[in-house]
């Protein structure tokens, strides 16, 4: 469980510290989702329950769909602005 906490904190730090790069923000969100998935899998194996493994597969599918949608939005953003950096004013 310590590994999942470390992974989740790395994802949060990556999201907070890289506020200008959209790709790094998406990668940080994926790291957070995979940390939660790993925690659910470890808990499922400790409790000897198959439901947690089913939830983990569901989370991985949702994370893949989220990545595809995020990258599609990123391509549209790049075509509109010509850059993927976010400018705060």
UniProtKB/Swiss-Prot annotation:
Its main location: mitochondrion. It is a multi-pass membrane protein. It catalyses: a ubiquinone + NADH + 5 H(+)(in) = a ubiquinol + NAD(+) + 4 H(+)(out). Its EC number is 7.1.1.2. One of its GO terms (cellular component) is mitochondrial membrane. InterPro entries: NADH_UbQ_OxRdtase_chain4L/K, NUOK/Mnh_C1-like. The keyword Oxidoreductase does not apply. It comes from the Eukaryota. One of its GO terms (biological process) is ATP synthesis coupled electron transport. Gene3D superfamilies: 1.10.287.3510. GO terms for molecular function: NADH dehydrogenase (ubiquinone) activity. Keywords: Electron transport, Membrane, Mitochondrion, NAD, Respiratory chain, Translocase, Transmembrane, Transmembrane helix, Transport, Ubiquinone. Belongs to the complex I subunit 4L family. Core subunit of the mitochondrial membrane respiratory chain NADH dehydrogenase (Complex I) that is believed to belong to the minimal assembly required for catalysis. Complex I functions in the transfer of electrons from NADH to the respiratory chain. The immediate electron acceptor for the enzyme is believed to be ubiquinone. This is NADH-ubiquinone oxidoreductase chain 4L. The gene is ndh-4L.
């Amino acid at each position: 469980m310590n590994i999942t906490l470390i992974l989740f904190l790395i994802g949060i730090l990556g999201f907070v510290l890289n506020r200008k790069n959209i790709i790094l923000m998406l990668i940080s969100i994926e790291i957070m989702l995979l940390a939660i998935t790993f925690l659910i899998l470890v808990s499922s194996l400790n409790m000897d329950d198959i439901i947690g493994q089913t939830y983990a597969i569901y989370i991985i599918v949702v994370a893949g769909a989220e990545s595809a949608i995020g990258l599609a939005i990123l391509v549209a953003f790049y075509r509109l602005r010509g850059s993927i950096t976010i400018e705060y004013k």
